[in-house]
Amino acid sequence: MRNASGFLKTAGAPLVSATWLPPSPPPAMPMVAAGPQMERVDNGSQGAPQLFLTSALARGVSGVFVWTALLLTGHQIYSHLRSYTVPREQRFVIRLLFIVPIYAFDSWLSLLLLGGHPYYVYFDSVRDCYEAFVIYSFLTLCFQYLGGESAIMAEIRGKPIRSSCFYGTCCLRGMSYSITFLRFCKQATLQFCIVKPVMALITIILQAFDKYHDGDFNIHSGYLYVTLVYNASVSLALYALFLFYFATRDLLRPFEPVLKFLTIKAIIFLSFWQGMLLAILERCGVIPEVQAVDGTRVGAGTLAAGYQNFLICIEMLFASLALRYAFPSQVYSEKKNSPAPPAPMQSISSGLKETISPQDIVQDAIHNFSPAYQQYTQQSTHEAPGPGQGGHPSPSTHPGPASGSGGGKKSRNIEKRMLIPSEDL
């Protein structure tokens, strides 16, 4: 017999009461919070794909390209130092060649140290500072090719500046070339040599206080303001370099400047616009916001900088090949074997020490930014090489910059001050 509670009851037996117990649920599994922690667990799991930039393939490929570029450029620098016959030119040529080792090795180290801590900021600061050094060195090399400021003024003084939107001279309509024009070209490149190290120092300080994040264009982040100042400064320097080439391209033609100019501009411009493109891709979400590298979280800006460094490692091999053709050492080795070499030979260590010394840059900056600039200009003069000495031909005959007594005497490098007429100021 069944009672209301659902229990059976037999005759003569006491009623046993009980409550209905539902079946017990299975033991609960430990919960994992969703969000960044879950992302980190997933990314750190064995089945997750490895980030390409930290893979052995990326590091191996970039290393092969970097060390090949270092060997090629190192041999070229050594060849110039072995034939250091024209110091006033080769000093700047070697400085230009050093862009490959500095760019390539800095980028490779940044790639190897890619992780939670943005070590690349420190390496990129060194690389970017040398970029300013390269722009100045190339402009000064062109000045040396042509014999100095006064020799250049003897050729272009008073000529009207052709207005052209393509060459960026449309705003100079009605103006003529003067010493003020040359001074602007020098000042515009020198200001980048000053601004870039200052901005690099500011970047390191902001990074230490967690106020600088690559690719973060927030108004409260230092990246926005550093980028604006840097872009304005490098654009002005490259514009001045282009203006000078536009004004003197006929004079520079014997020195085959096109390949030199395009190679230097390509190295600087390519890395500049490449970085800007990666920053835009990061802002558009193409580069993921967060990735896990060796268990640490890496922002999208750091990843964009990592891709930039990887591409620079690859590109520097092609840059080293282009520089071998743009700045060959054979023209100087021929002078070394001539009966009357243009200058006494120096040891390799002395030539290298002269090349890396920034003393001439400091002196040039003081000279070009000095209020007394309008009273004089600096000109590098040398005796013209005698017959059979080889070397670059002179673009024209000047009364002042080139003089000498023939090939029997050794050429001398003379630094002097030359007065400029007041009507040229």
UniProtKB/Swiss-Prot annotation:
Tissue expression summary: Expressed in vascular cells (at protein level).
One GO MF term attached to the UniProt entry: transmembrane transporter activity
Membrane topology summary: Multi-pass membrane protein
Gene Ontology CC terms, in alphabetical order: cytoplasmic vesicle membrane; early endosome membrane; endosome; perinuclear region of cytoplasm; plasma membrane; secretory granule membrane; transport vesicle membrane
Transmembrane domains' residue ranges: 51-71, 96-116, 133-153, 189-209, 226-246, 261-281, 303-323
Family: Belongs to the TMEM184 family.
Record-given protein name: Transmembrane protein 184A
Naturally occurring in which organism (per UniProt): Rattus norvegicus (Rat)
Upper classification of the organism: Eukaryota, Metazoa, Chordata, Craniata, Vertebrata
